[in-house]
Amino acid sequence: MCPPQARAEVGSAMTEKTEMVCASSPAPAPPSKPASPGPLSTEEVDHRNTCTPWLPPGVPVINLGHTRPIGAAMPTTELSAFRPSLLQLTALGRAPPTLAVHYHPHPFLNSVYIGPAGPFSIFPNSRLKRRPSHSELDLADGHQPQKVARRVFTNSRERWRQQHVNGAFAELRKLLPTHPPDRKLSKNEVLRLAMKYIGFLVRLLRDQTAVLTSGPSAPGSRKPPARRGVEGSARFGAGHRVEAARSQPVLPGDCDGDPNGSVRPIKLEQTSLSPEVR
């Protein structure tokens, strides 16, 4: 602690130095505050602690009598603005750099290898649904062989079904008559022409059936007269033979070994009609 006499001497010395500074510079500029004041020397700290006993030790006190030289002053604020401190550089290095709009991940590049698109994408992910490729499916389901086997079986079955459908359309196309025989038709045209051709065949079959049902009535009515004609001709032939036998003359003595010469009556042939003729 300083005695009262030392306090008075220090106070008078500080007053005199202050007056001298004010006289030398009538309008002094306010002292520029250094950007980062350097550490105080040991002598200044000891002098402050000894001359200001009413303050606790370690409290910085500005002493006008012990100023630093002009050459040792810190750079001005203008230069320090271009050279930021290490703390500011560390803070800027930790923050993520801002990206422009065209540097953000594009939603079309969203895949297993690149990862999902960020929140700053041009389009929302809910509106764009891209079908994953075979390589991505193999990579995602590589540890699940059951899914891989099921997918392979489904693909082969679909391929087999498509081949059979195409083969059936090709066979149906061969049965359809077209003006250019080698004209290429789509599946829709093949089905439409097949319907028309089937309808034409149905109408043609109905017409043929109607002609066959109405035709045999006329020949059936002509059969009975033909039978009667056969019966009449048979009867006419039998009567003609009877009349010829009757008109044949009988010679005298023409007897079969009859010594008396008596004439025997000639037996008339009575022809009976067979049941077939009747």
Curated annotation (Swiss-Prot):
InterPro entries the record matches: bHLH_dom, HLH_DNA-bd_sf, TAL-like
Domain of life: Eukaryota
UniProt cross-references to Pfam families, sorted A to Z: HLH
GO CC terms: nucleus
Region of interest: Disordered: 1-46, 212-278
Self-association and partners: Efficient DNA binding requires dimerization with another bHLH protein.
Molecular function (Gene Ontology), one example: DNA-binding transcription factor activity, RNA polymerase II-specific
Sequence ranges of Polar residues compositional bias: 269-278
Classification lineage: Eukaryota, Metazoa, Chordata, Craniata, Vertebrata
Primary residence: nucleus
Modification Phosphoserine occurs at: 274
Residue stretches of biased makeup (Pro residues): 27-37
UniProt entry keywords in alphabetical sequence: DNA-binding, Nucleus, Phosphoprotein, Transcription, Transcription regulation
Entry annotated with the keyword Transcription regulation: yes
Coiled coil location: none
Protein name: Protein lyl-1
All residue ranges annotated as the bHLH domain in the record: 149-201
Gene Ontology biological process terms, A to Z: B cell differentiation; blood vessel maturation; definitive hemopoiesis; positive regulation of DNA-templated transcription; regulation of DNA-templated transcription
Subcellular location(s) per record: Nucleus
